[in-house]
Each structure stands twice: as C-alpha cells, then as structure tokens.
Amino acid sequence: MSQLNDSDIILFEYNFHYQNIRSKNTLDIAFGIDRNFLFGCGVAIASILLNNREISCEFHVFTDYISDKDKLYFSDLAKQYNSRINIYVINCDKLKSLPSTKNWTYATYFRFIIADYFYNKHEKILYLDADIACKGSIKELLDYQFSTNEIAAVVTERDVEWWQNRASVLTTPQLASGYFNAGFLLINIDEWNLNNISSKAIEMLRDPDWVSKITHLDQDVLNVLLNGKVKFISGKYNTRYSINYELKDKVDNPVNDDTVFIHYVGPTKPWHEWADYPVSRSFLIAKASSPWCKEDLLKPVNSNQYRYCAKHKFKQKHYMAGIFNYLKYYNCLLYTSDAADDVALHC
C-alpha cells in the first residue's frame, strides 16, 4: 500500500489542454522538480515537442511551487504545440524527513509520487529529470512493450568498475551486471505498484543501516529494489554529459547524431549564462522555440556558481568577466554564509 496517497500529496492541479481529445496512442511523460528547475523543465518539454511533432505526448509536472507567470508559460507552451500539460502542486511534508544532500533536495523523491499517482490511470510513464534536452525521436518509447515482470526500462550509468563498486557498497552482487541512472525511467506502472516499490524505497530511506550505505539516495535504492526486473536499453536515451567537463584540456563528448536525450548532469546547466558551448545548443534551440524565448539565461547567485562561472569565463577567454566573477566568489566567502554551499541541483 502506498505511503503517498493522492489526497495527502496533491494540493492543486492545473490542466492546460489544447489537444481537445486525447489520442489513444499517447506517451505520458512526467517530471518532478522544485522551483530551480521550472525554467529547465519548460524548455525540456519544448525540446520533446519540437522533435516529435508526429507523436501524441501528454506532460505531467510535479512541483512544490509554481508562480502565475510559470503557469502562463506552460499554458502558452501547450497552446503553441497543440499539446496537453498538467501541473501538480504537491505537499512535500512526508518527503522532507528523508535524506538529502547539497546536490539532491527532497525533490529527487517526487518520482515515487509520480509512479504511485498514475496507478490505475495509465499503464506506462516516462519519467525524466528536468535537466535534459531532446534532439531525436521517442517513437520507440511510445511503442515499447514490457516483458513479463519487467518494472522499468533504464539506461546504465558509467562502466563496469562503477557497477562493481555499487554492488559492493550496496551489498547487492547482481548490480555488478548493470547499475542504472534514475534520470530516465520508462515505468511499467502496474508492476511498480504490484511490487510496492515506492513504499519499500521510503522504508529503506528511513533505515539507518541503508542510509549509511547509500551515496546516490533514491537512485541507489531503486537499483537495489529493481535489480533483475529492469531492461537496459540504448544509451541514446540518457546520454549524460557534465558541462563542467569543458574545463578539461581534452573533452570526450558522448553526444552524437544518434543521441535522443542529452542529460546535463553536474552543477552547470544549459540555462546558465556561462554554459556557452556547442553541447548546450539543443537546449538553446528549444528555448528559442518556446514561451521562454525572451527569458535571459541565469546568472550566478551564490559562491559555487560564481566560482564555476569564473572558471568557464576564463576557458572561453572572457578574462575580465572571469576576474569579475572570481571577485564575486571571494566576496561571498568573506561576507556570506553560503561559502560551502553548492547549488541545490539534481545530478
């Protein structure tokens, strides 16, 4: 039985439906975000719509905050692409007691709410982190058929050495055969709920023994619970890249012509004004084709962002801007309490 019942969790729901009749062959796509990701989420949805005009998609955004301006933008986006977008404002009280870090807030647990909410409503949900940009067709995901007992289709994270590390740390030997990134989950809703995944995950996250082992919060927990019940599909659906890799002398960029979803992991996101690299292009194209087209890219607001902004400005040979942002960074160290803070962003 789920610990995340609709009546306790969903406070408000806003529906922006400009496709009057929902197609029977529709892919439902869900995001779980806090206010820091509203901009990115809107553009992520635009990127999917821009590259999949022949596919019927309905979008579901679960958030703990939304302004009137945000609602207007999401409504305009649905109207622009003749689509359907639903916003759910949620009560996070039951999630705030769960473990969090400077990089992952309680918003990372919204995917549990999502998987439970759609039980008996839809058979399949594509969950995506909001720091993605789509640059290809998702028709294969629309047509995807789950095999018997399969709970989710997923994409592996990193390499065999990492899988073995997770298998050892999480005392789950089966993970040596594959460990997935939870930023992409094509979920079999019935199987997820029949196996009580959300409830079991929350119980593990409240167990001190498990909390002492996990470093990647719900991602670690889901890998343990779903081991042997997932199918690993092509990496093109979750091609992870940190824009901070651009600071290296040599960059191995996995994004190619086959990539469907670029997943911008790490603290620098494509909506930051210092993320001026070719890998951000898919995001910027979608932004230009969305209601957010006239919104400025975000400037740094805390010590961690000033530091990364300065590094990137020097890499881009904008030396005066680099010096300015280093000065802002050191000013934060001297006069504010956020010197040790990182941006509260999903990785």
What are these regions (language model features)?
Residues 1-32:
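N-proximal low-complexity "stem/linker" segments adjacent to membrane-targeting elements
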Residues 38-52:
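Histidine-anchored nucleotide/phosphate-binding helix
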Residues 81-116:
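Active-site-proximal specificity loops/subdomain of glycosyltransferases
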Residues 136-162:
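Conserved donor-nucleotide/metal-binding helix-loop-beta segment in metal-dependent transferases, i.e.
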Residues 158, 177-274:
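Catalytic core and acceptor-binding pocket of nucleotide-sugar-dependent glycosyltransferases
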Residues 335-340:
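Conserved small/polar residues in nucleotide/adenosyl-binding loops
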